[in-house]
Amino acid sequence: MARFARPLALLFPLLWAVACAEQAPEVVRTPTPPLPTTTAPRATATPLPGSGAAAPVVADESAPSPSPTPAYDPDSPRAVAPYRGIWLAQQELEQLPMSGAAWENLLAAADQPLPGPDIADQDDMSDVYLLARALVYARTGNPRYREAVLDGIEAVMGAEGNPRKTGILAVARNLPGYVIAADLANLSAESGLGPAFRRWLETMRTTTFHGSGGSYTLSGCHETRPNNFGTHCGAARIAIDLYLGDEEDLERAATVFEGWLGNRDAYAGFIYGRATWQANPGTPVGINPPGAEIAGYDVGGALPEEMRRAGDFRWPPKRTQYAWEALQGAVVQAELLSRAGYPAWQWEEQALLRAVQFLHAIEWEAQGDDQWQPWLINAAYGADFPAHSPARPGKNMGWTDWTHGQTSREQAGNGANADG
């Protein structure tokens, strides 16, 4: 997009907002109880609603008012500086190869023309392809890729459509790629577009979306839905928390995730469906505990809320892709939290490793747009699950055969075996 065309592009979200204002879309801010101050992130987090009484919200009247942010000028110079590394840091990127199948696949994706982003479309892939451009920029320093990322960030603001019609799953799947791309391109250095994107993220995380799947904010979905909806919402929520520097909500989100993995003492406020795949129906969890059995069959590591999508318990299980789909959101949550200092990959006796071991035990390997997951899981655990390269990107993440493939290979002989 040419620079002189940007002011016109910015008018469309504004005109849409004016039109939608007459419909009074509901914007709900999910209250967040204050959590105790700690010197480091905790492996066990503060109980939340569903696991005990939440502390009341106390307004900090002494907090200074935020300084006004400058108006966005699309023709202003674009600064380039080191970025924070929500997903990868500069020193990590510098070690990654610029040759091989994974790199060539990433480069081809970065050079692919993109249609306008549509966050209201749960199958839109603009987010992961914009992430490809950001990764190539961060590795090569080629400014045209950064310019393309900034164009994409500019275009996505307002692409969520009418909250009364947009579904929360679409929003959750599409947001992480944009957030991480913005971090890789050091969008915060932009005096106008940077603050504009931050304000938009604040709006996205507090807006109630009423489309298919129910009416939720990102945090409300994360704390209620123990299936793929909730895991994707958690990934988007955590990515935004990290980008905005919201440590309080980050800790709350970590607590919810730990509860989903199986620590009901941390959080147990989810609403589950049929419990026929739960090892302990009276105390349902997102991932069955180690050694769990149903009718004499080992179901430790199974995702009950997704396994039931193919029907009540039976053996062998009827195949469903929902288990891998839920893991797309879960492994992104774990990686983001791990980089922020939370030992999320280790929680509940390495629950995510056990989940993948269960799927391999019943011969359900990652296929299609789940192919990126084994690279990340192998890197996290030093495991050796089958991993394909070039790997297809997923609904909320991709390119891990390049970003994490080297780590996977280095750790394969030193960590957990894929068979347990």
Residue ranges and their predicted role:
Residues 17-19:
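C-terminal motif of bacterial Sec signal peptides marking the signal peptidase cleavage site
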Residues 22-71, 75:
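Ser/Thr-rich, Proline-interspersed low-complexity disordered segments
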Residues 58-59, 63-225, 231, 235-236, ...:
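Extracellular glycan-targeting catalytic surfaces
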Residues 293-317:
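Intrinsically disordered, low-complexity acidic Ser/Thr-rich regulatory segments
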Residues 247:
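Active-site neighborhood of glycoside hydrolase catalytic domains
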Residues 1-9:
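Bacterial N-terminal signal peptides that target proteins for export
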